[in-house]
Amino acid sequence: MAAYLNRTISMVTGQTGPADDDRHASSTDTVDKSGPGSPLSRFNSSLQQSGSTMAANLLPESRLYQSNDKSPLQIFVRAKKKINDIYGEIEEYVHETTTFINALHAEAEIVDKAERELFESYVYKVAAIREVLQRDHMKVAFFGRTSNGKSSVINAMLREKILPSGIGHTTNCFCQVEGSNGGEAYLMTEGSEEKLNVVNIKQLANALCQEKLCESSLVRIFWPRERCSLLRDDVVFVDSPGVDVSANLDDWIDNHCLNADVFVLVLNAESTMTRAEKQFFHTVSQKLSKPNIFILNNRWDASANEPECQESVKSQHTERCIDFLTKELKVSNEKEAAERVFFVSARETLQARIEEAKGNPPHMGAIAEGFQIRYFEFQDFERKFEECISQSAVKTKFQQHSSRGKSVSGDMKSMLDNIYERITIFRNLKQDQKNLLTERIQGTETQMMQVTREMKMKIHNMVEEVEEKVSKALNEEIWRLGVLIDEFNMPFHPERLVLNIYKKELNAHVESGLGSNLRARLSMALAMNVESAQTEMTDRMHALVPNEQLLATSTKMVVRTQPFEMLYSLNCQNLCADFQEDLEFKFSWGIAAMIQRFTGKVRERSKKGQPALVNRQSSIGHSVSTPTTTPVEATPVCLLPAPVVAGITPEQLSLISRFAVSSIGSQGTVGGLVVAGVMLKTIGWRVLVGVGALYGCIYLYERLSWTNSAKERTFKSQYVRHATKKLKMIVDLTSANCSHQVQQELSSTFARLCRTVDTATTDMNDELKTLDSQLNILEANQKQLKLLRNKANYIQNELDIFEHNYISPQ
């Protein structure tokens, strides 16, 4: 076996002559002395187990010429196609079911909002899974700190220096390397379809260049598939900026890592794992379920300078990496973690493969001693990487999607079963509802006729009561009109312009006062009576329509923003517009005043005696009139006998009085002298002078007392008589108007309630008509639910077959 190992090493180094046997033996001794935990010891153990197959895999040229048909990655390709087909059926099924559930929710409240949202969430969930499954490749993402050699590792696996690498921060954006069908390499920037020469990657992705891209931007590099077997099998490499460059790790993961199948953490073997590197993969493990992670301790060639502490450092790094994968991330067990930690030199491997491409032996690219071990370790990483993809990718990726597909179909089937049961119950409820509606409509029509008769009678009685109360209250207020007018305190002046304003304000005062007094006496009681009647109407109508929605509608129509208020339209401005005051001074004991006072009494007697006179004229007797009981001496000034006066009309009597007064006024001087002469001869001059002096004093007193106050009192007295006469004329009209307002209020309320009941009855009739159609729809829904349940069973059977063919044999 030692000879086999020496021969394999010689094939790698290019030295096969016997002169190098000592060197080969020295190399073998180095392998033996490296200890059981070293990479070469692990490689030696693997060699002894796998024999010549392992030796063939160690040859760098062998993987370049592997047949694509025999690649283990083809299992993944076939499985991916099958699971994509199944998920296409699942997506169609989920869309069909969700559309049906949404329509069912709109037609009848069988499905609640939470269930409907859950069905809709399956649409997005399946679409997200399909988006991952429909990729044409597997993605491998490389992460690590700045200048740890991520780009160098990808270049070594691609066997050419494609990505920028070197000292310092080299990769400033995400670079995605994927296979192209053509023989030329090109690149495309994010948001552009222009194909650029791959040489320009140094100008687009290098941080040292003036024209640099954003850290989260993506540059896609298309490399010929035939130049790398991994690209030929649709594997994509993603190079990233250093995790310590930007704090936007969540954006990086969301934009570039959610669909990654394998993550490679590239560490610097000269230092320990940093918090930034750990934090990034902690975030990845939170967003992805158990990601596949490989850890490469790069730049291990630096350990050749300190061979005495090489093993202790390696053991320390290995232990920390295993603890990170098992205890912190919990993505693998210790055995799997130990198989995913490697110590390599990417730069050295890249140089060796470049020399190999030139036809030179690989060892010409060696940087330090121990090249063979590091080179074998890198080959071991590539082999384990392919095995992980071919053996684990299908299981870790598709098994989860298969289980989720079963879970989706199973959950939907269970929910559909529950909905089917609820529809059955709902159908029974609909049938019972139909029977209840029929009975309710018949009872409503009968009770509606009875309530209408009772409410009409109640409105009629209330209207009569209101008319009587308003008439009585208004008459009482008219009787107290003098008190109301005395309360008016506006300054009075007999000037015509001022007097017109005074009358206008007095009319407004009377109208306001009467209205206020009537409202104080009647409005509260009337409003309470009206509200009580409306409440009774509403309660009676609500008893006819117990539906909550109709009750709310009728209540909204009846409720007023303000209580009912009676409007008393007196309109004193127009009513007393014909009032004409008489503010001229009149001596109360003057001849004209005496005549007017006498004629006034005569008018009163004539008004009282006029009906008797009419009766006497209409009686059969007509011949002789009965003598008057009033003696002639009671009216010495009147020149006509009482029977004649009793037969004179008021218009004729007024004309006679005016003529007498005017005659006396025109002949006052002569008449006065005649009367004075007669009285002088009859009673003597002393008595006449005394009476004249007394008469003059009385006249002078009344004349001096005729002030604005006296004029105002006279004006108000005249206004009271005039307003009382006018207001009594509208008592019946006002009371009728108020009763009409009450009638309108109650009638409109009852009419609205009747319309509400009629609407409810119409709705119930319409509901009866729609119940049969709803029952037919429910039957159709039950048939559709059965069909959807059968489709769910079919999908579960398809997933069982997929697991048996692709997941169980693995």
From Swiss-Prot:
In a knockout, what does one observe?
Lethal at the early larval stage (L1/L2); mitochondria are fragmented and mitochondrial respiration is impaired. RNAi-mediated knockdown is also lethal. RNAi-mediated knockdown in specific tissues such as cardiomyocytes, muscles and larval neurons produces various phenotypes resulting from adherent, dysfunctional mitochondria. Mitochondria display characteristics such as abnormal cristae, fragmentation, elongation, decreased DNA content, increased ROS and depolarization.
Gene Ontology cellular component annotations, sorted alphabetically: axon cytoplasm; mitochondrial envelope; mitochondrial outer membrane
Region (G5 motif), start-end ranges: 327
UniProt biased composition (Basic and acidic residues): 20-32
Q: Keyword Ligase on this protein? A: no
Enzyme class comes to hydrolase
Q: Where is this region: G4 motif?
A: 298-301
Q: Which residues lie on this side of the membrane: Cytoplasmic?
A: 1-637, 690-810
InterPro entries assigned to the protein according to its UniProt record, in alphabetical order: Dynamin_N (IPR045063), Fzo/mitofusin_HR2 (IPR006884), G_DYNAMIN_dom (IPR030381), Mitofusin_fam (IPR027094), P-loop_NTPase (IPR027417)
Signal sequence range: none
- Show the stretches that span the lipid bilayer: 638-648, 669-689
Keyword annotations for this protein, in alphabetical order, are:
Coiled coil, GTP-binding, Hydrolase, Membrane, Mitochondrion, Mitochondrion outer membrane, Nucleotide-binding, Phosphoprotein, Transmembrane, Transmembrane helix, Ubl conjugation
The record's region (Disordered) falls at 13-40, 609-630
Tissue distribution = Widely expressed in embryos, accumulating in the mesoderm and endoderm during gut development. In the male germ line, it is expressed in spermatogonia, spermatocytes and early spermatids.
Q: Describe the function of this protein.
A: Mitochondrial outer membrane GTPase that mediates mitochondrial clustering and fusion. Mitochondrial fusion is the physical merging of mitochondria that gives rise to mitochondrial networks, and this process is counterbalanced by mitochondrial fission which fragments networks. Promotes, but is not required for park recruitment to dysfunctional mitochondria.
Name the record gives this protein? Transmembrane GTPase Marf
Species this chain originates from: Drosophila melanogaster (Fruit fly)
What is this protein's gene name? Marf
